[in-house]
Amino acid sequence: LRRAADLNWSAIDVSIFGTLFERGLDPAKRSQLGAHYTDPATIERLIGPVIRRPLLQKWELVAQQIQALAAKITKKGDKHYRAAHALFVTWLDELKNYRALDPACGSGNFLYLALKCLKDVEHHSHLQAAELGLDREADLVTGPHNVLGIELNEYAAELARVTVWIGELQWRLAHGYEFKTNPVLDTLEHIECRDALLAEGGGEAAWPAADVVVGNPPFLGDKKMRAELGDAYTTQLRSTYEGRVPGGADLVCYWFDKARAQIAAGALQRAGLVATNSIRGGANRKVVDA
């Protein structure tokens, strides 16, 4: 431990915590949780279409409006400048209030890369706004508050909080932004340690309000659910989601159904979840087709 403390950890790849989490579980527990490390390339395949591309497309529309106003600016502070600046501030407010939820966040790799994506988009918009003649803002509005998580395993939930903070600080350091010092690290209570499907007192668990959902939910086949999760839990789960998720469906389908229901209700813009090929057949197919 003393030797490790003497090393420079400032450039650590935070995705390593996913490996630490997976290896920290005994094989039986890992099987029960369906817990497996998701590599950054796979995560980006979801982050791109769910978060990055839609936000960049929206920013391009805002930038075009700013550019049209910028062409009319005769001096800094005139009505055209103020209108252009107001558009940019409104855009920043949208980024500040944006929320990405991983309702099975494990050690936080999806949260880290979602946060990085948001910060990259904001940084890009700051640079373009400056090119169009607007003054640079003092600081960024995106940060750890933008990513929400739910994780049943207490160890993994704490790793997720550490992962997000390290990712935030590394990004700021790499892009020339100072660290906040008061406090140095806020608590990340919005990365919750609880069940994402069933509420503690019974019934369906609520998910926090978010713009998008991304993640790699646990997968566990129908025949293994009772053996791994217990009769009582499996019975309650299937009863709670009766009529929405067939009794023979894989555990991962419950996350798909909840995301689908929120999109249908207008409470969620998009969702991107990892699943195995088995989701395309049998009882699972009914959830996908819903």
Labelled PLM ranges:
Residues 1-26:
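Long recognition/docking surfaces used for binding and targeting
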